[in-house]
Amino acid sequence: MASSCCLHAILLCSLLFITSTTAQSETSFRPKGLILPITKDALTLQYLTQIQQRTPLVPVSLTLDLGGQFLWVDCDQGYVSSTYRPARCRSAQCSLAGAGSGCGQCFSPPKPGCNNNTCGLLPDNTITRTATSGELASDTVQVQSSNGKNPGRHVSDKDFLFVCGSTFLLEGLASGVKGMAGLGRTRISLPSQFSAEFSFPRKFAVCLSSSTNSKGVVLFGDGPYTFLPNREFANNDFSYTPLFINPVSTASAFSSREPSSEYFIGVKSIKINEKVVPINTTLLSIDNQGVGGTKISTVNPYTILETSIYNAVTNFFVKELVNITRVASVAPFRACFDSRNIASTRVGPAVPSIDLVLQNENVFWRIFGANSMVQVSENVLCLGFVDGGVSPRTSIVVGGYTIEDNLLQFDLARSRLGFTSSILFRQTTCANFNFTSIA
C-alpha cells in the first residue's frame, strides 16, 4: 500500500513538473517576429488575412487595411468567447486607445459589443467609407511566430484590444470576412500591440502577392526577411524615405484634432522614362486642412490620381509608349493598348518606367510594367491608374496593385518607409515566403 502511494506521488510530481516546465517555456518564449498570410480575393481585389481569436479559438477572416486604426470584428452575430472583456470607462485600456472619457450604455441584455459603463471607438469600413460606434474590448488572439524566414510556433496575446462592429459594416467586404485588420499609426493597431506584447522592434513588412492563388505575407518585427529561393532582404537592400503624419484624420468618422492613422510619403515629382511630368506640385503637399499629399493603401485596388495629375501622367505615358496601338478604354482605365506588340520582361510588360521621386532626385520608387499595366483581356493592356476627381482628399493614393511583389518595411519607431521596388528583379516574388517549413 505504501509502495502504491509513493508511486502515485512520484507520478503526480512528474506531471506537475512537466506542466510547470511547459507553462514556463510558453511564457518565456519571445518570438523574433510574427507573420500573417495574405490572400487576394479575385472578386473584390481585397487583401485578406486570418487570425485565431476568442476562447475557444475560432478562425476570423479579415480584410487587410494598411492604414486602419485597429482590429474590428462583427460582434452582432456568433461572437462567443469566455475571455471577452469590455473596456470599462476611464480605464487604462480606454486611455491607451484614445477613447476619451465618455461612457457607453446598453439597453439590452449584456453581450459582446453591448455592455454598460464601457468606452468605445468608431469602427470604419474603409472600403465603403461607412463608420459607426463600437465597444472597445479585449480577448485572446493567436498568431504564428516567425524568424523572418520560416513560420514558427503559435503565440497568444490574451488581452488584445479590438473594437466590436455591427453586421451592417461588413457590406462591401469579401465573402466570409468578419471585420478588418488595421495596421495603421495608432497605439492599438496590430503592429503596435504585437510589438508591445512580444517586445520586438516596432517594424513590420508587407509583401502582397500578385496572384489570387498564392499567399503574400505581413511580417511583424525586424528583418532580414527571406523568400525562396534563399533571397534575403536586409536593411541595406531597402531605400528609405520619411513617413509623414497627416494632422487631420482621413477616417470616415473621427474626433476633432485626431491625426490620420494612414501612411503618407513625400512625393516631390513624377517621372516617366526618367523625364519629369509637368504637374501642379502644390497638390503633393498636405495643407492645414489635411488635404493633398500621397498615401499608401491596401483598400484601394489601383493607384488613384487627382484629375490634373492623372491627365498629365496618362498623356505623358501615351506619348512615351511609341509604336504601340491604342485601343478603346476599359473602365476604370483610360489608356489601353494592343498588347500583342508589347514585349515581356522579368518585371512585366516592356513599357516606360514611372518614378515617384521622393526627398531628393536620388531617392525614387520606380514602378515597372508588372505594377503599372493591367491585363484586362487577352490582347489588351491598360495603364492601371484611376482618375480620382478634381478635389480628392488625398492627391495620390498608391493602391494595392502598384505595391504587389514589392517589399515594404514600415519602421514606426523611426517614422520611415523602406522599399525595394519590384523584387521580381531578385528572381523571387511575394508568394515565395516559405509557409510550409517550420522554424
UniProtKB/Swiss-Prot annotation:
All copies of domain Peptidase A1, residue ranges: 47-420
BP-aspect Gene Ontology terms: defense response; proteolysis
Keyword Protease: yes
Gene name of this polypeptide: GIP2
Glycan attachment sites: N116, N280, N323, N434
Role, per record: Involved in plant defense against Phytophtora parasitica. Contributes positively to Nicotiana resistance against P.parasitica. Binds the P.parasitica xyloglucanase XEG1 and inhibits its cell wall degrading enzyme activity and its contribution as P.parasitica virulence factor. XEG1 acts as an important virulence factor during P.parasitica infection but also acts as a pathogen-associated molecular pattern (PAMP) in Nictotiana species, where it can trigger defense responses including cell death.
EC number from the UniProt entry: 3.4.23.-
Keyword Secreted: yes
Subunit field text: Interacts with the Phytophtora parasitica xyloglucanase XEG1 and xyloglucanase-like XLP1. Possesses stronger binding affinity with XLP1, a truncated paralog of P.parasitica XEG1 which has no enzyme activity.
PROSITE patterns, alphabetized: PEPTIDASE_A1 (PS51767)
Top EC class, one word: hydrolase
Protein name: Probable aspartic proteinase GIP2
GO terms, molecular function: aspartic-type endopeptidase activity
UniProt main location, coarse: secreted
Organism in which the protein naturally occurs: Nicotiana benthamiana
Keywords from the UniProt entry: Apoplast, Aspartyl protease, Glycoprotein, Hydrolase, Plant defense, Protease, Secreted, Signal
Similarity comment text for this entry: Belongs to the peptidase A1 family.
Cleavable signal peptide: 1-23
Annotated compartments: Secreted, Extracellular space, Apoplast
